Curated annotation (Swiss-Prot):
Residues 1-24, 156-197 are annotated as: Disordered. Residues 161-188 have a biased composition (Acidic residues). Keywords: Virion. The keyword Protein biosynthesis does not apply. This is Structural protein ORF142. It is found in: Virion. The keyword tRNA-binding does not apply. It comes from the Viruses. One of its GO terms (cellular component) is virion component. Transmembrane segments: none annotated.
Length: 410
């Protein structure tokens, strides 16, 4: 059953690899399976083979290779089973084999040797053997012995030496066959009601010769049968080896393809990592630029606020200056009006002076004393008027400029 174990490993076989020497056990199980398959058409051995019990949970946990070997032990003449998957094989088993409660009866040989450690532990726990034994710490041979002992004690078989027959070597099998042949010959003579004691010596010798010849013929027939079985086994082994080689080649091809795909994926992952690193670097740089821009914007906002406050203050100051300027302009306009009035007064005085000058010139023309006296008086009056105009203008100008000075510097 385990010839496909290494290739059809569809379920949990890790415990078996960790607790057993896989190559040795697999080879033993493979040989036992070949033996069981070679004897499947032997009616006599089928009658002597005991009824075994398998848990349905254990059967459901079997790999496709184990299920295929179980079905082949029941239907050696069917070729369609090699194309069935695990579900189809399980369906065929459940339809054909008998059952006893939760344990399926199967007519096969060394089925316990074909279970892995996990399946054996599940089987022991379902039989509640874990209450008396630490099955989790037992290896595969100990679990096999425990299960065989349990079924031998709780499910008696048709013969008492079944376990001995299972573990018997090929030489012991030949001795058993020879002993069975001898018993069959003796039984055949007894069943024919032959009275050997009534024969004479010649008859006895003839019977002995016939018995010896029959034994030799049976041994030769047995040898031919064994040779035929060996040839079948060799052919089966060749086919199995060829199938294993094909599967190994397929597995190597699949492995190379997987390695190639893994290399491609790894290269893609490396490229993706490089892109991610570049993207992360770019994102980091952009984040730094954004942070710097945020800092600059914050500073600009502070500066704008300061400038706005300063501008508002300067605007207020300018408005105050404009107000004061308007007031000063109004004062200057008033002063200009006063200056204009003074200029008018001066013009009037100049006109008066010219009139007086004309009068004086007219008086000079008369050239008389009265005129001269009048002229002198007029000159005196003129000088007095000039002095008065000068003092008045100086006073007015001083007052105007002092007022302007006070207003401009106030």
């Amino acid at each position: 059953m385990n010839q496909n174990h290494t290739l059809d490993n569809e379920r949990n076989d890790d415990d078996e690899h960790s607790n057993n020497h896989v190559d040795t056990n697999d080879m033993k199980n493979f040989i036992s399976c070949i033996k069981s398959k070679s004897n499947i058409n032997d009616d006599k051995e089928d009658q002597q083979r005991p009824v075994r019990y398998l848990s349905r949970t254990v059967i459901n946990s079997m790999t496709r290779g184990q299920l295929l070997e179980l079905v082949k032990s029941m239907y050696s003449d069917r070729s369609d089973i090699y194309h069935m998957n695990s579900i189809q094989l399980l369906t065929l088993i459940n339809k054909t084999i008998g059952h006893n409660g939760n344990y399926v009866q199967v007519v096969t040989k060394d089925y316990i040797n074909d279970l892995n450690v996990t399946q054996l532990r599940i089987f022991c726990k379902e039989l509640q053997l874990d209450t008396t034994h630490d099955v989790d710490r037992m290896n595969k041979p100990m679990l096999e012995i425990l299960l065989k002992s349990y079924f031998k004690n709780n499910y008696p078989t048709s013969t008492n030496d079944d376990n001995d027959n299972e573990n018997r070597s090929d030489d012991d099998d030949d001795d058993d066959d020879y002993r069975n042949d001898r018993e069959e010959v003796e039984d055949s003579d007894i069943n024919k009601n032959v009275n050997i004691s009534s024969y004479n010596n010649e008859d006895i010798e003839e019977v002995d010769e016939r018995t010896k010849s029959l034994k030799i013929d049976r041994r030769l027939l047995k040898m031919h049968q064994d040779n035929a079985k060996l040839v079948d086994k060799i052919d089966m082994l060749k086919n199995t080896i060829e199938d294993l080689q094909n599967r190994l080649l397929t597995a190597e091809t699949t492995r190379d393809d997987i390695l190639r795909r893994y290399s491609i994926l790894e290269n893609r992952e490396n490229i993706r990592d490089d892109d991610d690193n570049r993207n992360s670097t770019t994102i980091s740089n952009l984040q730094n630029l954004l942070n710097n821009a945020n800092i600059a914007m914050t500073r600009s906002r502070i500066n704008v606020a300061d400038l706005t406050a300063s501008l508002n203050e300067r605007t207020k100051q300018l408005e105050d200056c404009l107000t004061r300027g308007r007031e000063k302009d109004a004062s200057i306009d008033k002063l200009n009006l006063k200056v204009t009035e003074l200029e008018k007064l001066l013009q009037i005085q100049r006109d008066t002076h010219q009139d007086a000058t004309l009068k004086i010139s007219n008086i000079r023309m008369n050239d008389n004393n009265a005129t001269r006296i009048q002229i002198s008086s007029l000159n005196d009056e003129l000088h007095r008027c000039q002095d008065q105009i000068k003092s008045t203008s100086i006073t007015v100008y001083n007052r105007i400029y002092s007022d302007l000075y006070e207003r401009l510097w106030s």
